[in-house]
């Protein structure tokens, strides 16, 4: 009999994110209009699971509030003892008959649902004990390196701070996403030790434990390295925001919409634009905007929850909120209107 919920999803969101140099918890920093952890959670929507567990710690109440509209189970990691310890805290929240656990980090807002679904399918099809997502980076600094044998078989992960010079030259890195058989996972976590430079319990150690116990371990190589970008600085935050904005803009342009300097334009995921419309540089469509066909929105205009009927025109630097622009109507430049 097929199980209804063979998979539990665990998202790690307890850390402080000190490199962000912010009082705001790292996973709550906005990327393309919403906290980055919401993007991670959304990427799991296509997986066969109704159990999404968020490990919280730093600013736990704020993280709970940010995800209040999502069906999540929250587990508190009282002490920050490492990623293995974080996953261990989720044990009681996972049903005993659950077969697999997928573990993600709350600071990877670019991860695609397609990659997660492909990884999970491969994990199940190949009857693997552990499937690890990896990728190749030109500059692998700050990432754990993948150590393989001469045949290319995955052996272990070495964290940056524990890597020797030869290991640091390795370009294949740990993307921080795992799919693990539940029964093996919690046996292995009990064996993880903190004998490393950080004195922490590393989740990465389960790879070495799986190999040594002759479990089936495989990698899923992420096709797009930027998809697994971990946001650890304001620079990476800006990069992630730009990438999601451009993904959205490419999607819109493919429907027959023209854009001037698309890298400067922000179109919310809830907004719709008809074909043969022209969007100027620096335009922002916030909330739920409905733009008809043959519309024109000039440079720097900001529309929030607005409707533009076909053939209408909004002038440069106008700011409209909750407005309806009638067919063929033109709103002059620099107008401020709210309804």
Swiss-Prot record:
Protein location:
Cytoplasm
Q: What is its main location?
A: cytoplasm
Could you tell me the EC number(s) of this protein? 2.7.7.23, 2.3.1.157
Do you know which Gene3D superfamilies this protein is assigned to?
Answer: Hexapeptide repeat proteins, Spore Coat Polysaccharide Biosynthesis Protein SpsA, Chain A
Q: Which GO terms describe its molecular function?
A: glucosamine-1-phosphate N-acetyltransferase activity; metal ion binding; UDP-N-acetylglucosamine diphosphorylase activity
Chain residues that bind UDP-N-acetyl-alpha-D-glucosamine: 12-15, 26, 77, 82-83, 144, 159, 174, 232
Regions annotated as coiled coil:
none
Please name the Pfam families in this protein's record: NTP_transferase
Homology family? Belongs to the N-acetylglucosamine-1-phosphate uridyltransferase family.
Q: How does it assemble?
A: Homotrimer.
Protein's job: Catalyzes the last two sequential reactions in the de novo biosynthetic pathway for UDP-N-acetylglucosamine (UDP-GlcNAc). The C-terminal domain catalyzes the transfer of acetyl group from acetyl coenzyme A to glucosamine-1-phosphate (GlcN-1-P) to produce N-acetylglucosamine-1-phosphate (GlcNAc-1-P), which is converted into UDP-GlcNAc by the transfer of uridine 5-monophosphate (from uridine 5-triphosphate), a reaction catalyzed by the N-terminal domain.
Its recorded name reads Bifunctional protein GlmU
Species of provenance = Desulfotalea psychrophila (strain LSv54 / DSM 12343)
């Amino acid at each position: 009999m097929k199980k209804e919920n063979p998979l539990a999803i665990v998202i790690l969101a307890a850390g402080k994110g000190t490199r962000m140099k912010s009082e705001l918890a790292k996973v709550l920093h906005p990327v393309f209009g919403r906290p980055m952890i919401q993007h991670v959670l959304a990427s799991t929507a296509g997986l066969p699971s109704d159990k999404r567990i968020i490990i919280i710690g730093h600013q736990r109440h704020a993280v709970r509030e940010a995800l209040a509209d999502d069906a999540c189970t929250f587990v508190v990691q009282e002490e920050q003892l490492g990623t293995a310890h974080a996953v261990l805290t989720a044990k009681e929240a996972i049903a005993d008959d659950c077969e697999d656990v997928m573990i993600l980090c709350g600071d990877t807002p670019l991860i695609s649902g397609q990659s997660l679904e492909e990884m999970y399918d491969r994990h199940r099809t190949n009857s693997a004990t552990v499937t690890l997502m990896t990728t190749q980076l030109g500059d692998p600094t700050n990432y754990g390196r993948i150590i393989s044998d001469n045949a290319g078989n995955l052996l272990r992960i070495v964290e940056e701070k524990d890597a020797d010079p030869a290991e640091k030259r390795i370009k294949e890195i740990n993307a921080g996403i795992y799919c693990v058989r539940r029964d093996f996972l919690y046996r292995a976590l009990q064996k993880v030790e903190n004998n490393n430079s950080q004195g922490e319990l590393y989740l990465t150690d389960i790879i070495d434990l799986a190999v040594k116990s002759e479990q089936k371990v495989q990698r899923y190589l992420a096709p797009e390295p930027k998809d697994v970008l971990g946001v650890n600085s304001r620079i990476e935050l800006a990069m992630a925001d730009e990438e999601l904005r451009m993904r959205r803009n490419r999607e819109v342009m493919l429907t027959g919409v023209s854009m001037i300097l698309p890298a400067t334009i922000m179109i919310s995921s809830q907004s719709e634009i008809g074909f043969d419309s022209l969007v100027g540089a620096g335009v922002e469509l916030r909330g739920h905007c409905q733009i008809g066909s043959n519309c024109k929105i000039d440079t720097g205009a900001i529309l929030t929850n607005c409707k533009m009927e076909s053939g209408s025109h909004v002038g440069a630097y106008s700011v409209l909120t909750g407005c309806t622009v009638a067919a063929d109507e033109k709103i002059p430049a620099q107008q401020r209107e709210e309804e």
